[in-house]
Amino acid sequence: MSVNQSIKPITTLRLTNLNIGGCDLVKLAQEYSTPLYVIDEETLRQTCREYVEAFSDCENVHLMYASKALCIKALSKIIESEGFGFDVVSAGEIYTILDAKISPEKMLFNGNNKSKEEINYALESGVRKFSVDNFYELELLNKFASKNQNVEILLRITPGIECHTHDYIQTGQIDSKFGFDLSQIDEAVELIQNKYKKLKLCGLHAHIGSQIFELKSYQGEIEILVKELRRINKKYSLNLSVLNIGGGFGVKYTEYDCPPSVAEWADVVKATLAKYKDEITSLYIEPGRSIISTAGVTLYTVGGYKQVPNGRKYVFVDGGMADNPRPALYDAKYTVELANNHQKRKKEIVTIAGRFCESGDILFKDIELPQLKPDDILCVYNTGAYNYSMASNYNKVEKPQMVLVNNSQSDIIVYRERLDELVMTENIPDRL
């Protein structure tokens, strides 16, 4: 079974308490306090290796981790060591990866609205690969690039593919904020040929969405990209041969999710590309969620509760929508388990509510769990992606700590914010 087909990290064990990476989760919560993000190193490495193995029979396949899923220095070092480059979308992600002593040559800069400052910073830092979303960005790139920088670009297009996923994470449909419409490609190519001489057009890029289970969506994406590449090459006497098919491959958040394995997905990609092996010399793939999600869990401590007369029982935890906004944003579903020993406890139906001042701060609604008590530890699975990376300081609450576990050892890789750090960037004018 592929890692992305598992809800839990591969080292998860139930001894007396729940264990991951050889570490007792209840003891971790006591040592580091909660909320606490926990990343299992073995699961992360195994996931990376599945991708590398799936494409080991292909030349010139570039696996680029989508850093937006979770961009942390220690994790970037692990991911690089397993053979990945990095899809980055901001100066902050570039800075983080550079600070981890990773070469800028391993980065591809994406994003639909890169600022002047970000483009200039990327170029000055040594980033030379860009995926370009619009005409203004072409102009900015050419303006800031020097003649000797050899800036390689891909044009991001919207292929018109609507995959089965949440509306907010579809990106490949025609009505999208991302990329050039197919009808705009010729104008972009002509500008690069005739005006923007500092830019080297290498190929095309598309990204059709996130949390995708339908393999035919990727097949359709590749067919459209190759068809457009052929048309451009013929019309403009070019020899473009690079494709970037993005990421978006799905994971198993609940028992109702049935994602295909990494190997099954790779087989479809390779079989489709095999028809064009003489035309496509380089392929970029940008998995993010499917690399880091399963490796991560979040620990919460149970606090009080509220029993609505003749209604729901709300159980409160010490985190919620500030450390995981996805349930509130997308009605995202997760799987939760009591980390404490609970063999003798009866089951009950409860709603797990966060601590934040919003009625929508509900992590789980009407689920069955062993009877919960104050100071119990809940473990929410599959929180490696788009939890810490989307976290906020709502209600002036500090962002949680993150630890890496492996072989019964735990190491802090992100320190919990301090109260004084919450006001470090604030200023009171002298006139007040």
Language model segments and positions:
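Charged (often Lys/Glu-rich) extended helix/loop segments that serve as interaction or gating elements
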Residues: 268, 279-432
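A charged N-terminal "starter" segment
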Residues: 1-152, 194-196, 200, 234, ...
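Structured core elements
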Residues: 85, 108, 129-131, 154-156, ...
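Conserved, mostly hydrophobic/aromatic
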Residues: 44, 68, 90, 122, ...
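Short acidic, glycine/serine/threonine-rich loops at helix termini
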Residues: 76, 99, 119-124, 141-144, ...
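Active-site loop/helix belt of alpha/beta enzymes
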Residues: 2-7, 159-305, 369, 397, ...
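Flexible loop/turn segments at secondary-structure boundaries
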Residues: 71-74, 95-96, 115, 162-163, ...
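Glycine-rich, aromatic-flanked loop segments that form ligand/cofactor-binding clefts
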Residues: 150-162
